[in-house]
């Protein structure tokens, strides 16, 4: 009887888990504010509304592999199943490899006589996978892209978009005369803006091997040549990330976004850096809701100076009629 009950409990747990997954997949808008701007934070395992900051799901289980790989060869070697097509690998993940286990299909050990031949086959198979200059370029560039995206904590969708942008740049021969690292960084910056999870040029440059000036110049070039239509970044897009870094509540996040929307309606954000406006709005919101953070703390997270925050928050308070008691 005890065994039957255990089996039944496991079945109930599986059913509950299945329903939870179905419920999450059915969520298309925020149940709190009705916004469709939902984003999954893989680093913290959360499903979040970008507008009001509601955490819709905070126990997201990563369905990916339990192992880590630092290049495509290592990834292929450790994988136990066929992967889906992806633009983040130079051959889109369609090629195969000869395993190093030295065993045949039935699990029997390969004879000593045939191992030397198998070694040569592996060597040539690796060479065939990257057979020309374009493939070598893609292999290096996409591994660099993966490294930077991991360091920045970007989701898979942004990596795929950045890989597609880079591939288009290669097809149109826009790489000539420019460093691969610079074009990769520019493609990643464009993908972040396109996906609504912006990173500043300074943040991209921190993890890139090129400076901020080159990334900006290359970004303007590829967006013009590829005809990418990218809307200006809204300060509100930075709020969820800054809020999380400062340990502020969802109420503060909601209030900061509300302040930014009012500022945009009155055109107070025109000609001003979005990170500076976002930092100032967050600083004001934290004071209004009793979760005060210092200007230095906010400045460090936002990557701006304390002077910028002081100028922006005074401007917002004056033009929007917000009374701040310091």
Curated annotation (Swiss-Prot):
GO terms for cellular component: transcription preinitiation complex. SMART domains: CYCLIN. Sequence repeats lie at residues 143-226, 237-318. Pfam families: TFIIB, Zn_Ribbon_TF. Coiled coil: none annotated. Keywords: Metal-binding, Repeat, Transcription, Transcription regulation, Zinc, Zinc-finger. GO terms for molecular function: DNA-binding transcription factor activity; TBP-class protein binding; zinc ion binding. InterPro entries: Cyclin-like_dom, Cyclin-like_sf, TFIIB, TFIIB_arc, TFIIB_CS, TFIIB_cyclin, Znf_TFIIB. Zn(2+) binds at residues 30, 33, 49, 52. A zinc finger (TFIIB-type) spans 26-57. GO terms for biological process: transcription preinitiation complex assembly. PROSITE patterns: TFIIB (PS00782), ZF_TFIIB (PS51134). Stabilizes TBP binding to an archaeal box-A promoter. Also responsible for recruiting RNA polymerase II to the pre-initiation complex (DNA-TBP-TFIIB). Belongs to the TFIIB family. NCBIfam families: PRK00423.1. This is Transcription initiation factor IIB.
């Amino acid at each position: 009887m005890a065994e039957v009950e255990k089996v039944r409990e496991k079945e109930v747990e599986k059913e509950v888990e299945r329903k939870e997954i179905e419920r999450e997949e059915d969520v298309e808008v925020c149940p709190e504010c009705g916004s469709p701007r939902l984003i999954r934070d893989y680093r913290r395992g959360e499903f979040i509304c970008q507008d009001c900051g509601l955490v819709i799901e905070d126990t997201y289980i990563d369905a990916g592999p339990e192992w880590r790989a630092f290049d495509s060869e290592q990834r292929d070697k450790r994988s136990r199943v066929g992967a889906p097509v992806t633009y983040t690998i130079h051959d889109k993940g369609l090629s195969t490899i000869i395993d190093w286990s030295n065993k045949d299909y039935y699990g029997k050990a390969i004879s000593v006589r045939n191992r030397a031949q198998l070694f040569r086959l592996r060597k040539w198979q690796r060479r065939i996978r990257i057979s020309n200059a374009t493939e070598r370029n893609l292999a290096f560039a996409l591994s660099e892209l993966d490294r930077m995206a991991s360091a920045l904590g970007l989701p898979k969708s942004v990596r795929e978009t950045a890989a597609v942008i880079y591939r288009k740049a290669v097809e149109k021969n826009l790489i000539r005369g420019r460093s691969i690292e610079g074009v990769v960084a520019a493609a990643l910056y464009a993908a972040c803006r396109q996906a609504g999870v912006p990173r500043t040029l300074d943040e991209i440059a921190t993890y890139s091997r090129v400076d901020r000036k080159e990334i900006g110049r290359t970004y303007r070039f590829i967006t013009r040549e590829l005809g990418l239509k990218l809307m200006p970044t809204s300060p509100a897009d930075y709020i969820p990330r800054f809020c999380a870094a400062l340990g502020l509540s969802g109420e503060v996040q909601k209030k900061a976004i509300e302040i930014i929307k009012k500022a945009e309606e009155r055109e107070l954000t025109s000609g001003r850096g979005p990170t500076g406006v976002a930092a100032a709005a967050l600083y004001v919101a934290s004071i209004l809701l009793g979760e005060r953070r210092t200007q230095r703390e906010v400045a460090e997270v936002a990557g701006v100076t304390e002077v910028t925050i002081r100028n922006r928050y005074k401007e917002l308070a004056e033009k929007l009629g917000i009374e701040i008691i310091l």
